[in-house]
Amino acid sequence: MQPHRKGQNGFLFGVVIPVALNLGSTTLVSGLRSYYNNRYRIERRVSFLHDIWNPWHGCVKCSEGCQNCYMYFLDRMRDQNGAEIYKTKNGFSYPLQKDRTGHYKIQSGEQIRVCMTSDFFLEEADPWRAEAWDIMRQRSDVVFFLLTKRPQRVRACLPPDWGNGWDNIFFNVTCENQRRADERIPLLFDLPFKHKGIMCAPFIGPVSIRQYLAAGQIEQVICGGENYDGARPCNFDWVKSLRQECVDANVTFCFIETGTVFIKDGKRYHLPNKQLQSRMAYKSGMNFQGKSIRFDLVDDWGYPIPQENLYVPHFRANCETCGSRLICNGCSNCGKCL
């Protein structure tokens, strides 16, 4: 086998090893939390937060960000079809499941991402959504992170008792490029949610949201490059520009990963290892803690839960340099970042 050739900044053509890449004033090294350690290793958990609730699986592609969907890629690796949409059997009631001691598996105060292998507002899921809303209604002590590319469907899908919104729902729209930001953020603003954010992932084109941040409704912005099959490049200049807009508005900004193809100072880098991507994102110094987000969580009786009774995220040493550290719900001890 021919040896790999070493390029500038320590990268090898065709493979990435734990060597340094200089991004601005910060040195980036390999390392941390991955979906898989190489292109063909599949992880069961797809998460930058502590846990995930997938009440249904499968989706229909609807915009540019869907082109190289990670769920389709992972399903294909399992000889499954990502376009087949079905209600999950054991996972549907997950937020209500208890351990052997009778306590909820998901603790009060945790933040759970919903439908990470689908879209919560998918038309095909209409028959199941009311039951999912009921589960979130029962777990008013847990924050549910909703992310959609279909904000135009949301108002018609809200439960009858929604009112001005539930405090335990954090609603986000995907803005993979400027076209989708200009299309979806105005719809986001028109919807009755108490907590709103946006996610530029896959980040496949420059996005400016300064005019939208000025409205004061957006509490958090997440961005990250594209991964898996046929990943499109993420440009560090886009990240820096978006971050500055968030800093100016005092809105939390989190750069979770570079993506497989990353461009910095005109140079193109191939980084198939998501551990490396995550650590590089952290070491870039882009993450910014803006105004804190307060979720007023209540117990089964509707009483406020004291702060000392809420889940406290715990982290291990490797977590300290993870790109998602700023917004993560804590280490799940899955052992995959060792």
For every predicted segment, state its role.
Residues 114-124, 172-173, 223-232:
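Surface-exposed cleft-lining segments at the edges of enzyme active sites
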Residues 117-119, 149-151, 174-178, 201-203, ...:
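Active-site beta-loop-alpha junctions enriched in small/polar residues
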Residues 137-140, 192, 240, 247:
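Anion (oxyanion) recognition and catalysis
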Residues 66, 114, 146, 188, ...:
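Conserved, mostly hydrophobic/aromatic
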Residues 2-12, 19-23, 29-57, 210-338:
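Auxiliary Fe-S-binding modules of radical SAM enzymes
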Residues 128-135, 184-187, 238-242:
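A general structural detector for well-ordered alpha-helical segments in enzyme core domains, enriched
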Residues 175-177, 190-210, 218-220, 225:
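Histidine/lysine/aspartate-rich catalytic loop segments that bind and position anionic ligands
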Residues 20, 24, 32-169, 178-181, ...:
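Conserved Radical SAM active-site core
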